Structures are given as structure tokens and as C-alpha cells.
């Protein structure tokens, strides 16, 4: 009973509110006493180091368990929905790349390594990816080689699809255990944000927050373009009539709820209720909605892409178009692994950053920046992710009814 009480105290409460309080307190301390603000920077450094420690094992276990246990139905009616999910996520990543090119954003990081060697075009990037793919799995986890981690987790996940049910249950249990550790780490985000903001403000001044505001504007701009322009275009492609009544309904009845719950998984019952009211067959939405909560991650793809390119620009790296397209693909794949994990999209940023040879300590600092703006970013990301689940499911269902 005492353990439950302790867990509830650590993990309970409104995380968004606590992060906002940490943000404000960090700014106030930096303004009142810059020296003290630099001293509490150790709290932010400890938080970032915790994120660096948990990210490799999180990616490895989560992807492996997800693939090993994934049971996608053979019903052909799900295939068009899956196509919409994948296409929507990729289009979102490409949109984020374009906006990042139009409005390049740099960040004020606490430290930045000297002598960083950026990759020379997509050829070098692909060479790095291929060599990282065949890294020793233990070495990949130890050294934070996320490409190698992803390769091994996918390979083992595919192999374990044929394992005994008890093995799959064990994988799920391990995945749940790692996710719990992640939740504990994320629960200390307000303290970490307090330290990061205080040290950044004391070291770099108010200019740091101009970069944060610009970054947030690019993120929200990309999400708005996807929600109000590109998603309706994809829906029109399926139903061949005005897509906005359906789009607005999904944003109002699903997106608003998801904005405040900040959890696609928690919003599944809301989406199922909306799908039922829209007249979608239960045998379709009962599978498509939970599946979408796991793999339909347009908002996460935008977050990963924008923050990765911000990290690249901060290090003086300007990716060429081919590398940016590769990033869009990687971000789309990463986004599918972000579901069900607090701060999941942020914790997968190091994987995308590895395309540009950006060190893990820089990527971890970018994760910290993500938590600073996460009060708004995470809510908007979840609203886009979750509302799109029911939007695409409804669009495909309406298209099938029209054709039949």
C-alpha cells in the first residue's frame, strides 16, 4: 500500500502544470540570481543524463515487443486505412522538412562540442547508416547507436512473432517495466526543466527563448498545415466531396479531448464513440482506432523532424534535399515507435540525429528543449495524432460505402 502511495505521489498530478511552474521558477531565478541559476543547472544536467541513459533500452525493447506482438488483421478493408496512416505520417514529416528549410531555427544549448564533422551528402549518410546497422547489439545499446538498435530490435521482433505466447507475454512485461521507468524519469521533468531553463537563461540571456518561440511557431505551423490543409486533401482523395465537415467534427470531438489528456491511448474510447456515431462498422473501427493510436503519428513525425533539423542547424549542418527526404522516412518510422510512452517522440530524437553525426549529448539537450516547449507542443501533437485516427478511418469507411 505504501509503495502504491509513493508511486502515485511521484507519477501523479498534472505534469503540464508542474512543468509550467518549473519553467516560470527557472526564469525567475535566472533574473534574480544568475549565479544561483547556474548552480542549479546540475538538476537539468542530471535530467538530460537520465534521458540519455533510458533512450537506447527504451527503443530496443519497445520496438521489439511491438513488432513481436503486432497482430494486424487480414481484413482487406484495413489495408486502405493503413495506407492512409502511413501516407499521412510521411506527408507530415515532409511538411516539417519544408517549413524547417523556409524558417531555419537554431537553439541556445548549454554546451556544444567543437570540431563536429557533418556528413557530406546523402552518400555519406547512407554509408554511416549501413555500417551502423551491423553494429554489435550490446555495443549499439551501450554507445547509443540508434540505427543499430533499431535494426536489431526489428530483426528480433520479426523473429519473435513466431515465438511461444509465454515469450510474447514476457516481452510485453519487459516493455511495460521499461515504460514505467520512463514514466518515473519523465515525472521529474519539472525539476529538470527548472534547472535547464535557469542555466540556459543565466548563460545565454533572453535570446534563448526567442529561439524557443520560433521553434514552437514552426512546430505548430506544420501541425496546423497538416490538420487543416493536407489531411483534408487526403480525405477528399478518398471521399470525393467536401472534407471539412468531417475534418472539423473529428478535430472538435476528438482533437480537443486529446489536447488535454495528452495521450492517444487514453483517447481511444473517445475515438471509438465518435466512430460509432459516424456510422462506421464496429468490426472496422474496433481494430483501426487502436492500430492508429500506435502507428498513425503525424504529430510525432513533425516533432522529430523539426527538432532534429533544429539540432542540425545549431551545429552548422545544412542537410541537402536527399538527406532531408531520408530524414522524413526515418522520422516516420521513429514516430510509429512513439506511442504509449510519455515524451515518446522526444526520446526518439537521438535516433534521427544520428543521421547527421550529431552527438548524443547534443541530442539529449534538444530533448530537454522539447520538454521546455512541451507544455504546448505535446498537447498539439497528441490532438493531431488522435483526431487523424478517426478521420482517416471514417474517410475510408465512407469511400467503401460509396463504392459499394
Curated annotation (Swiss-Prot):
Segments traversing the membrane: 10-30, 53-73, 81-101, 140-160, 177-197, 215-235, 287-307, 329-349
Keywords: Amino-acid transport, Cell inner membrane, Cell membrane, Membrane, Symport, Transmembrane, Transmembrane helix, Transport
InterPro entries hit by this protein: Na-dicarboxylate_symporter, Na:dicarbo_symporter_sf, Ser_Thr_transp_SstT
GO biological process, one term: serine transport
Catalytic activity: L-serine(in) + Na(+)(in) = L-serine(out) + Na(+)(out); L-threonine(in) + Na(+)(in) = L-threonine(out) + Na(+)(out)
Subcellular location: Cell inner membrane
GO molecular function: neutral L-amino acid:sodium symporter activity
Xref: Gene3D superfamilies: Sodium:dicarboxylate symporter
Primary localization: membrane
Domain of life according to the entry: Bacteria
Keyword Repeat belongs to the record: no
Membrane topology category: Multi-pass membrane protein
Gene Ontology cellular component terms for the protein in this record: plasma membrane
Function: Involved in the import of serine and threonine into the cell, with the concomitant import of sodium (symport system).
Family: Belongs to the dicarboxylate/amino acid:cation symporter (DAACS) (TC 2.A.23) family.
HAMAP family in alphabetical order: Ser_Thr_transp_SstT
Protein name, UniProt field: Serine/threonine transporter SstT
The species this protein was found in: Glaesserella parasuis serovar 5 (strain SH0165)
Amino acid at each position: 500500500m505504501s509503495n502504491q502511495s509513493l508511486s502515485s505521489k511521484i507519477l501523479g498530478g498534472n505534469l503540464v502544470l508542474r512543468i509550467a511552474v518549473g519553467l516560470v521558477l527557472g526564469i525567475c531565478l535566472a533574473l534574480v540570481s544568475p549565479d544561483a541559476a547556474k548552480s542549479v543547472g546540475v538538476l537539468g544536467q542530471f535530467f538530460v543524463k537520465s534521458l540519455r541513459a533510458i533512450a537506447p533500452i527504451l527503443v530496443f525493447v519497445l520496438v521489439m515487443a511491438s513488432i513481436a506482438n503486432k497482430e494486424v488483421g487480414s481484413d482487406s478493408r484495413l489495408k486502405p486505412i493503413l495506407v492512409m496512416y502511413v501516407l499521412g505520417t510521411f506527408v507530415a514529416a515532409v511538411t516539417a522538412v519544408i517549413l524547417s528549410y523556409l524558417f531555419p531555427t537554431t537553439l541556445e544549448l548549454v554546451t556544444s562540442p567543437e570540431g563536429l564533422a557533418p556528413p557530406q551528402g546523402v552518400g555519406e549518410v547512407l554509408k554511416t547508416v549501413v555500417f551502423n546497422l551491423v553494429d554489435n547489439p550490446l555495443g549499439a545499446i551501450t554507445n547509443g547507436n540508434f540505427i543499430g538498435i533499431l535494426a536489431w530490435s526489428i530483426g528480433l521482433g520479426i523473429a519473435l512473432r513466431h515465438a511461444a505466447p509465454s515469450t510474447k507475454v514476457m516481452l510485453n512485461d519487459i516493455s511495460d517495466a521499461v515504460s514505467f521507468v520512463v514514466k518515473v524519469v519523465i515525472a521529474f521533468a519539472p525539476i529538470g526543466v527548472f534547472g535547464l531553463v535557469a542555466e540556459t537563461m543565466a548563460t545565454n540571456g533572453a535570446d534563448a527563448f526567442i529561439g524557443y518561440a520560433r521553434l514552437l511557431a514552426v512546430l505548430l505551423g506544420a501541425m496546423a498545415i497538416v490538420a487543416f490543409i493536407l489531411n483534408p486533401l487526403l480525405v477528399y482523395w478518398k471521399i470525393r466531396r467536401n472534407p471539412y465537415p468531417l475534418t472539423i467534427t473529428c478535430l472538435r470531438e476528438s482533437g480537443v479531448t486529446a489536447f488535454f489528456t495528452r495521450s492517444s491511448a487514453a483517447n481511444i474510447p473517445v475515438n471509438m464513440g465518435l466512430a460509432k456515431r459516424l456510422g462506421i462498422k464496429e468490426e472496422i473501427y474496433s481494430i483501426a482506432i487502436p492500430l492508429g493510436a500506435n502507428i498513425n503519428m503525424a504529430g510525432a513525425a513533425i516533432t522529430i523532424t523539426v527538432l532534429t533539423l533544429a539540432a542540425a542547424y545549431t551545429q552548422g549542418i545544412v542537410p541537402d534535399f536527399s538527406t532531408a527526404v531520408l530524414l522524413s522516412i526515418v522520422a516516420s518510422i521513429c514516430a510509429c515507435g512513439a506511442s504509449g510512452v510519455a515524451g515518446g517522440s522526444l526520446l526518439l530524437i537521438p535516433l534521427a540525429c544520428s543521421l547527421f553525426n550529431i552527438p548524443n549529448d547534443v541530442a539529449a539537450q534538444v530533448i530537454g528543449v522539447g520538454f521546455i516547449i512541451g507544455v504546448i507542443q505535446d498537447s498539439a501533437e497528441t490532438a493531431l495524432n488522435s483526431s487523424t485516427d478517426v478521420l482517416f478511418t471514417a474517410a475510408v469507411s465512407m469511400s467503401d460505402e460509396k463504392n459499394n
